Regions:
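Catalytic cores of alpha/beta
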Residues: 82-92, 127, 134, 138-154
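Glycine-enriched alpha-helix->loop->beta-strand junction motifs that scaffold or abut catalytic
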Residues: 42-48, 66-75, 92-99, 150-154
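Alpha-helix-loop-beta-strand connector modules within alpha/beta enzyme cores
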Residues: 1-22, 65-79, 115-132, 180-200
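Active-site-adjacent beta->alpha loops and helix N-cap segments on the catalytic face
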Residues: 1-12, 30-36, 52-69, 83-89, ...
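Hydrophobic faces of well-ordered beta-strands that scaffold small-molecule active sites
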Residues: 21-25, 50-52, 74-78, 98-100, ...
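Glycine-rich phosphate-binding active-site loops on the catalytic face of alpha/beta enzymes
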Residues: 45-51, 56, 100-108, 137, ...
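Hydrophobic alpha-helical segments and helix pairs
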Residues: 16-51
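Histidine/lysine/aspartate-rich catalytic loop segments that bind and position anionic ligands
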Residues: 72-110
């Protein structure tokens, strides 16, 4: 599956060399692939950075230095339970941006509390100049717009996956209009973000 993922990156890069691509997943597939081989192949395919969700700072020494030496950003994650002492450890060695997990629990199952997210982002900004992206629990253009008023970026994953799932028939094949539905939803999220930024710049 990792090779298929990297092949998808290569195919994307054939048409788009500008959009940043961050791979997000778990460490075991990287370990099984071989850290050095994975980093080299990911970089060659056109990957820009990594988010390894189950690899805390204390356990990333096999991967992070190799990734950074190859020019891949190593994005770290902060959560609502990350206190000021822990933040320092999370930020040490992080690059690219910080991914703030807006809710605890499993992604896609709850809605982010915008006020709490704003407070958390402000706290993170006191510790780092890295951009801050917020994800987990963001499902609508309105939520995305509200979050980006405080953060630098919004990450939407589960809502897009659900949109794809809703467009499959009982055999798992895509129904007519699935691609258009997914693109339309992604466009509405983007417009929510862009609209919020336009409003913020307005006099």
């Amino acid at each position: 599956r990792m090779r298929r993922t990297l092949a998808m990156v290569e195919a994307f890069r054939a048409d788009d060399g500008e959009t940043p691509l961050i791979l997000m997943g778990y460490y075991n597939p990287i370990f099984s692939y071989g850290v050095g081989a994975f980093v080299a192949d990911a970089r060659a395919a056109g990957v820009d950075g990594l988010i390894v969700v189950d690899l805390p700072p204390e356990e990333d020494e096999e991967l992070r230095p190799v990734a950074r030496e190859a020019g891949l950003d190593f994005v770290r994650m902060a959560t609502p339970t990350t206190d000021d002492k822990r933040i320092a450890r999370v930020l040490d060695g992080a690059s690219g941006f910080i991914y703030y997990v807006s809710i605890t629990g499993i992604t896609g199952t709850r809605s982010a509390a915008i006020a709490a997210v704003t407070e958390a982002v402000e706290r993170l900004r006191r510790h780092t100049d890295l951009p801050i992206a917020v994800g987990f629990g963001i499902k609508t253009p309105e939520q995305a717009a509200a979050v980006v008023s405080a953060a630098d970026a919004v990450v939407v994953g589960s809502a897009l996956v659900q949109k794809i799932f809703d467009g499959l028939d009982d055999s798992g094949a895509a129904r007519a209009g699935l691609v258009e539905a997914v693109l339309g939803f992604a466009g509405s999220l983007a417009e929510g973000v862009h609209g919020a930024r336009r409003d913020a710049r307005a006099p």
